[in-house]
Amino acid sequence: VQENDLLISITADLGRTGIVTKEIAEHGAYINQHLTCIRLKQDKLNPLYVAYYMESDAGKEQFIAKNQSAVKAGLNFNAINSLKLMVPPLSLQNEFAAFVERVDQQKQTVQQSLEKLELMKKALMQEYFG
């Protein structure tokens, strides 16, 4: 795989996405039959924008509609190739992706703060009540 490749789960957890990071690409990685790799034209599509779109309700609905089996989830090449994508100008995609990254970073910071507070609370509870 290469940096910024879009990976999509095509079995089991249908439609989950991921972006190949520089670190992963530099160390070398391979995918198996449970993933598909899409190499986007980055002058037209921001990989992070596409990943978030695919995980949105609109994207998930497409995966559900194209699922080929009621027993075991799965998509083939034709199903993946027929997925529709709303494509705003690249500048808006980049703006959206940057905003979502900032929000995700802030969420992570808040989550870490909550975990620290919970540890402090437990320590105080232990100290006061044994």
Pin down the residues of each PLM region.
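Short, ligand-facing micro-motifs at secondary-structure edges
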Residues: L6-S9, D13-I31, L48, Y52, ...
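Amphipathic alpha-helical coiled-coil/heptad-repeat segments
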Residues: S82, M86-G130
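A structural micro-motif recognizing beta-strand termini
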Residues: K22, L40-K41
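Short, charged/polar surface micro-motifs in flexible loops or helix N-caps
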Residues: D13-L14, K41-K44, S56-D57
